Amino acid sequence: LVIETITSRNKEMTDTVTSTGPRLNEPAPAFDAPTTDGRKTLEDYRGKWLILFSHPADFTPVCTTEFIAFAKKHDEFTAMNTALLGLSIDSHYSHIAWMLNIKEKFGVEIRFPIIADLNMAVAQAYGMIQPGASDTAAVRATFIIDPEGVLRAMVYYPMNAGRSVDEIHRLLVALQTADENQCAMPENWKPGDEVIVPTPATPEAAMARAGEGYNTVDWYFSTRAL
């Protein structure tokens, strides 16, 4: 009986983990959803990086500050072959009215589409609905999807704290740079900083590391400039 109870609990925990959303380095969930710029599918973004992000509700102050920040970095994201796509469980008409309000009150134009996820299909698929926060509103979730449709990063913020768009931009730059240079990025890496050289995979490679011309502290820790 004790074994059965533990097994049942473990299964419940596993089900909770696996059913709450996508996983890193796996294909991002497909979607086909109405937006402020017509219907959009994940396949529409094939060949580009995509930042898909949710917010709790239109016409709310924290969300407004986030959208203004995303809008101000829109051109920088575009230059990085990256599209922005917002989402909330509000109507298409609410999104449009809010976009116009932001332009009128703050002088900022929102030039990226927003999904009107009234049936919560996309939000559920991406684990944007967190029952501990709300059953009817998405939390502040951010997903970075690469040009092959693979989920490369995801970040969740609570309802009462706005996300850092600068950090999302930094993370995107780090992912793209790591892919292009076959390296890893240290804590708080920024363009111009040295990068981490992959750790040797064999004893022979570890022994040879010191003579390879990197900035080597020990066999497992080497950096280099790009």
Briefly describe each language-model feature range:
Residues 1-12:
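Short, Lys/Arg-enriched N-terminal segments with co-localized hydrophobic residues
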Residues 13-226:
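Chalcogenol-based redox active-site neighborhoods
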